[in-house]
């Protein structure tokens, strides 16, 4: 029986991951969070533990010889580095580039295995983009993520959303620092729907580019219903992006008081363009709750790593352990009773 430590184990994604593990008795699961809060589950071999991972020495309080799933970006890179120095494996779901970069630096020179982008986005979105980037004609990729507001998301996800609206990023074309929302794009998230506005944001892109490739990758964020995206676009034009980022916690608390509306779904579109700016192809994904999809992607990655050949030391990405078809097959298996999913590949328009 192997040890599996879930940092953030009682949160929105963590609680779903614990439930998915109910059919995997080969794991001794340690659900760790700042507040000890039991999650309803039939799994017998789960231990709930309260631990502030930000305090010094927290790494020594975790079980040894474990695979660690890192869900909160509050986890210090130093803790991750300490676990990797013990030749352990850490799976990370983070969507903030600066944090992911810090984890990659922490993995340097260790015998452990850090896998970034283990989730829905980044994760499945990474695999979709990497599949398109394998075409040598591809010069630019634009990846749009749309989150439905059919329910209130967990605190960590909501805080990330508001932070992302004010976190500058380096433009792939010019290299200069750009404020989110400065270069929006419109995406067809499904074939029979008008293009929807999406706002440019900072996002991790590890694993997308083929070895030696120089594909430019742009990331965008949208909300369903679309008028919410337009409201955020107005706020950004008024220069409120940085303010929203700095007050992400306060805005998250406020958002939890708002009514739930829109679709309870997650949609991703990855579009490939050649050097003339002509669309080559695109991939469209539609699924259910983002937290369900992220938990299932973690499960699929765990299964792939257990059944795979050699474990890769240092920092690598989900692309090093899964391909797109494996991920989709695993999602359908784990989420068979939750809701429909669809993936379409659209060739270059005539």
Which residues does each predicted region cover?
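Conserved Rossmann-fold cofactor-binding substructure of NAD(P)-dependent oxidoreductases
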Residues: 50-65
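N-terminal Rossmann-fold cofactor-binding loop
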Residues: 31-36
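N-terminal Rossmann NAD(P)H-binding glycine-rich loop of SDR-like oxidoreductase domains
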Residues: 4-21
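C-terminal active-site/capping subdomain that shapes the small-molecule cofactor and substrate pocket
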Residues: 236-350
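Beta-loop-alpha module in the N-terminal Rossmann-like domain of NAD(P)-dependent dehydrogenases
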Residues: 70-83, 98
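N-terminal Rossmann-like NAD(P) cofactor-binding module of classical short-chain dehydrogenase/reductase
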Residues: 66-72, 90-92
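Rossmann-fold NAD(P)-binding glycine/threonine-rich loop
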Residues: 94-113
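Active-site-lining helix/loop region of Rossmann-like oxidoreductase modules
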Residues: 7, 135-271, 278-279, 292
């Amino acid at each position: 029986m192997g040890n599996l430590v879930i940092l953030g184990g009682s949160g929105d994604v963590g609680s779903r991951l614990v439930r998915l593990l109910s059919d995997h008795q080969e794991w001794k699961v340690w659900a760790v969070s700042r507040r000890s809060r039991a999650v309803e589950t039939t799994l017998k071999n789960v231990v709930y533990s309260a631990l502030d991972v930000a305090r010094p020495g927290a790494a020594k309080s975790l079980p040894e010889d474990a695979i660690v799933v890192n869900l909160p970006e509050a986890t210090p890179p130093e803790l991750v580095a300490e676990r990797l120095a013990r030749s352990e494996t850490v799976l990370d779901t983070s969507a903030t580039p600066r944090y992911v970069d810090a984890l990659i630096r922490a993995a340097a020179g260790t015998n452990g295995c850090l896998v970034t982008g283990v989730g829905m986005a980044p994760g499945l979105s990474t695999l979709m983009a990497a599949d398109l980037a394998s075409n040598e004609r591809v010069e630019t990729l634009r990846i749009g993520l749309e989150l439905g507001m059919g329910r209130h998301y967990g605190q960590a996800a909501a805080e990330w959303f508001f932070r992302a609206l004010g976190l500058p990023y380096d433009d792939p074309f010019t290299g200069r620092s750009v404020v989110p929302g400065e270069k929006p794009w419109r995406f067809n998230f499904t074939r029979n729907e008008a293009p929807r506005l999406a706002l440019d944001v900072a996002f991790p892109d590890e694993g997308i580019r083929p070895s030696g490739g120089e594909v430019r990758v742009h990331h965008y964020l949208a909300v369903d219903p679309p008028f919410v995206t337009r409201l955020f676009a107005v706020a950004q034009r008024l220069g409120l992006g940085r303010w929203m980022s700095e007050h992400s916690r306060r805005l998250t608390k406020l958002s939890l008081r708002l009514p739930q509306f829109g679709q309870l779904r997650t949609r991703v579109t990855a579009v490939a363009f050649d050097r003339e700016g002509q669309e080559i192809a695109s991939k469209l994904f539609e699924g259910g709750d983002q937290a369900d999809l992220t938990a299932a992607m973690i499960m699929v990655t765990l299964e792939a790593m257990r059944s795979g050949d050699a474990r890769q030391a240092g920092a690598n990405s989900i692309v090093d352990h899964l391909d797109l078809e494996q991920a989709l097959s695993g999602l359908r298996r784990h989420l068979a009773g939750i809701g429909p999913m669809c993936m379409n590949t659209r060739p270059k328009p005539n």
